[in-house]
């Protein structure tokens, strides 16, 4: 054999050795912090390897280095080795076939013997350290059987199941024999020996957030185990056996038997498992449905025996007793005694039942009285809260309704004073008292005007912030499963940047350096566009910086800073600089879109949008705007519509909860509900004549029909709740009362005759749906999602 052939054979031997190393390494569980086991075994046989030439040794060392480097896989590869360690087992016959294919040589045969001895020792040491572990997943009860080394820490087993279950390893716990195993412990520390079968449980410490579920794809997967088979007198061989979990029996399709060896060979069958035939239900048959009764008397047998004294037989009489007959009583006496006992039982039962009945009545009465007391307390509490709210609105007016309420109180006070003056004074004294009354009224009106100005400034700042929040809000979509999707566009991001700059400008208590930084940021932002507005803003910024450098006090710069903020807000409201704001401006950029929505106010002589006019359902033309109507009310009548607004809002909420596409109720305006309450129902309940508007509600007369002015009734809240529980109006009310209600409905239908025609034009109008959705009570459950921490 030539030297080249020897080198070639040695290289093939080393390569095959490396492959066998890799195959056998899948049986062991290499730990990253420890050295591979093959190194110790290899060092013991260095003397055998040194028999080769120097070139052969260098080549073998290079290959062994590569094999050692392959022993450092990641965690996933490590756990794959733990799960199926015996799928790639070492078979000496396979290597013997490979070695037999090569040309025999004395040196190569010696080297092969050394390699075989090393691998057999490694295989025995690894196989001896393995134990069969049955892992049970709690609470699903899934069982997974895997081989695992008894001297390997349990951290690798926990990491593997953490990867399969998608649960952090810190949440998983391993339990063996009722004890919780730690990560740095091994099975040997708990008395588990090699080749044993143990059962451990894996569960989650936080089942609500990280539940343990079944691992798909493992129940039907076959398992491979190694079985030791005796092949000779003192010879044993390990054979891999695959366990297939299937209850399907292969059908016998014929075959033949070898005459010499006696081995049976079956014909091939299909691997498709046939469909399971469903079990048929038990069917019972009977001849007829007629039941036959049979009455037979039968006397049961009773075996008895007697023992008499006799010669040779002794019977003890120590336990005998003398029985004497009692007093005889007839059947009538017996039945009379039973009847007397029954009467006694009935007497005591009826007494007990009467006590229970009276106790139930007493308890129901106490509950009823307690409920009535709570209702009275609730009404008193609501009245007190209404008075407190009234007092708070008088002293801290903020909305238009509050000032409307103040003017109403002023008019009520003026009427009382006027009546008192007319009754108490005459002539010159009356004129002097009227002049004094007029002066007081003027002072009160001036005070109300000052409060209105303060509230207007506060509301204006809040309106500006709400406007900026609306412009910078992201786009929101609601998915069918209840979740929301938010998306920011380049326009919303631009609007948010301008909003942040505006907030920084409006800050009060900041240092001079911080103010200079804000002005510098504003200057760079405004410089992007050149126009008259931006030029004026830049001049004001330079002026403020110059004054600050000269040491001007802050309170002297308030006017200049307010002017800068006002101009910058106009800058934000310009669609050229902030495109997102174009959707929320009252005056659109395209005049044609605004052409058909402008109306002329005959009072203030202004052209205003349609939203500035209050239109009743019975109106025939548009005459005056809202501001003119409110101004006329404050100057002349000074009426308060707050209670009517509450009544109308309660009607909106009630009709929105019906969800029957009612539209007439949402067409009713404040003037309509006022006319309906005052002129049709006389501002009082039909049943109890209660005239407290804060306690009255307007509900449907017939709850199966849509609400309308000719299908409503004015009742208190308690009466309305009882009215809506009626199943039939004819059974709940008298005929005279029903006739009275229908007469009022006819009056309302004549006055609101245009409402049905108006409702027919807005069947497909989306504004009604928006109003209904605004007052609809949201009862859908909130979905809270738990976000898992990253692995």
UniProtKB/Swiss-Prot annotation:
CC annotations in GO: 9+2 motile cilium; acrosomal vesicle; motile cilium; radial spoke; sperm flagellum
Domain of life of the organism encoding this protein: Eukaryota
Domain IQ, chain residue ranges per copy: 338-367
Keywords: Cell projection, Cilium, Cilium biogenesis/degradation, Cytoplasm, Cytoskeleton, Disease variant, Flagellum
InterPro entries in the record: IQUB, Ubiquitin-like_dom, Ubiquitin-like_domsf
Domain spans labelled Ubiquitin-like: 131-207
Region spans: Disordered: 1-73
PANTHER family to which the protein is assigned, alphabetical: IQ AND UBIQUITIN-LIKE DOMAIN-CONTAINING PROTEIN
Subunit and partners: Component of the axonemal radial spoke 1 (RS1) complex, at least composed of spoke head proteins RSPH1, RSPH3, RSPH9 and the cilia-specific component RSPH4A or sperm-specific component RSPH6A, spoke stalk proteins RSPH14, DNAJB13, DYDC1, ROPN1L and NME5, and the anchor protein IQUB. Does not appear to be part of radial spoke complexes 2 or 3 (RS2 or RS3). Interacts with CALM1. Interacts with DNAJB13. Interacts with DYNLL2. Interacts with NME5. Interacts with RSPH3. Interacts with RSPH9. Interacts with ZMYND10.
Record's protein name: IQ motif and ubiquitin-like domain-containing protein
Species name: Homo sapiens
Gene designation per UniProt: IQUB
